[in-house]
Amino acid sequence: MLIHQISVTEHLNIILKNYIPHHSWERCAIPNTLKIKSGRDLPDIQSTLPDIRINLTRVGVKNVKKLVEVSRPEKRPVIFISNFDVFVDLPGSLKGANLSRNFEVIDEVLQQAIDGDVKEIENLCSVVARKLLDRHEYADRTEVLMNSQFMVKRETPVSHTSCHEVVKVHARAVARRTFREPIVRKSIGAEVTGMTACPCAQDIMKERAMTVLQNLEIPKEKIEAFLGEVPMATHNQRGRGFLCIEIDDDQHVKLEKIIRILKESMSSSIFELLKRGDESYVVLSAHKNPRFVEDCVREIAKKVLAEFKELPGDSLITIKQTNEESIHQHDAYAERQATIAELFYELNGDSTEG
C-alpha cells in the first residue's frame, strides 16, 4: 500500500526538528519532492551545499575501461583497448558532481565513433570534453585522458613474414568555458619500442679491432674497408620512445606519422618474429646506426619539424626516451618539452653559427 507523500515528509521533518538547531533547520529540512517508490523524484544530494565550501580542481572517474572502435572509409575499423579518466572542476557551492553524466557522454561519443561521426581517434577526447561542458552546467573546465593499446600489423624486412606489434596511444583534451564557444586544447601521442646501439662501446671495440688487425699486418686500406662494411660490436638497449603533440582543436595530427617518427629515430625497429635473414638485417642496421638516448630525442625533434611544418608555433611538443641498459642496472633517460617555435629557433640558430 502506498504511503501518502506529504504525511511521510512532514513526519520526518517533525522528527528532525527535535534534533537540529533552529538556525540550521532550513538547510537540512527534507524537500517536499521526496518520493518513496523507485522511479519517482528523490533529493539531488550532489546539488546541496557542502559543509566545507572549497572549489575542487578535478572531480571525476578514473580507469573507465572501454573498447573503442573507430570506423574508416573502405577499411576495417581500428580497435583500441582504452582506459579513460574524466574530470570536471567543481564550485564550492556544490557538494558533489554528477558522475553518471561522465559515463553517459563517453558511451555516446564511442557510439558516434562506431557510426563514423567521429572519424579519428585524435578527436575522440575533444568531443567528449565539449559534451561534458554541456552536461555539467556548473563546470568551467573539463578534462579527458585516454590511454590505449592497439595492434599494428607489420612485415619483417627480409622474409616479409607477417607479425603484430602493440603500440601505446595517449590522448588528452581540456575544454574551458568562455562567453562564446569553449576553448579546447587536445593532444595525441604514442609510445613505441625499438632498439638502440651504444656509440661509446662501439668506438672502444673499433679501436681494439684496428690494433689487432694492424698486429696481424693487415694493410691499412683493407682494415678501413672491412670496418666500413662490418660495424663493430657494442651493447644494446631496448628503447621506449614517446612523442606527444598538443594543438588547438581545429588542428590535426596523424597518429601514423607520430608512430613512424618514433620508429625511425632509434637505431633499429624490432619485431616479434624474425627469421635468420631478418635477424641479421636488424642487428646490422642497429650497429650501423648507433645512438645515445640523447640522440634519439634530438632526432625525434628534428623529424617533428620536418613532418609537421603546417602546425602553429604554439603547438607543444613532449619527447621522452628511456633506454633499458643491457650492461648496467640502471636505465638511460632523456626528455625535451618545447613549442614548435622554440625548436625551430634552436635548429636555425645552430645552422647559422657555423
Predicted features and spans:
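N-terminal intrinsically disordered, cationic/polar leader segments
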Residues: 12-16, 20-354
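Acidic, Ala/Val/Gly-enriched low-complexity intrinsically disordered segments
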Residues: 8-10
